[in-house]
Design a protein with these regions (language model features):
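A cross-kingdom feature marking charged/low-complexity
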Residues: 2-4, 59-82
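Compositionally biased, intrinsically disordered low-complexity segments
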Residues: 9-11, 53, 78-80
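A short, charged, amphipathic alpha-helix used as a generic interaction element across diverse proteins
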Residues: 29-50
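Charge-dense, low-complexity polyampholytic segments
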Residues: 48-61
């Protein structure tokens, strides 16, 4: 089963938030941190998701896995590094 992946990447002078497989941005922000916060919100809402944040060079600088415990509703976040 594929886990949805929400990605933050640079687009001109803004940061766009998209989901893997989409060719358009769901939202755009002037600040990277605002885009990451929005992406994290999408990940929590979808219950099981990955958030990837790219840096200015297009390299993944942040990767987090969000999972929701179905019994308690607690959201767990695991940061991954390459």
């Amino acid at each position: 089963m594929d886990i949805p992946c929400v990605t933050v990447r640079r687009s001109g002078d803004r940061w766009g938030v998209t989901q893997k497989g989409l060719n358009w941005f769901l939202a755009e922000f002037s600040l990277w941190q605002d885009a990451i916060d929005y992406a994290r919100g999408l990940a929590v809402a979808s219950q099981n998701s990955i958030v990837e944040g790219e840096d200015f060079q297009g390299k993944v600088a942040l990767r987090q896995v969000f999972s929701t415990d179905s019994a308690t509703g607690v959201v767990r976040v695991q940061s991954l590094s390459d």
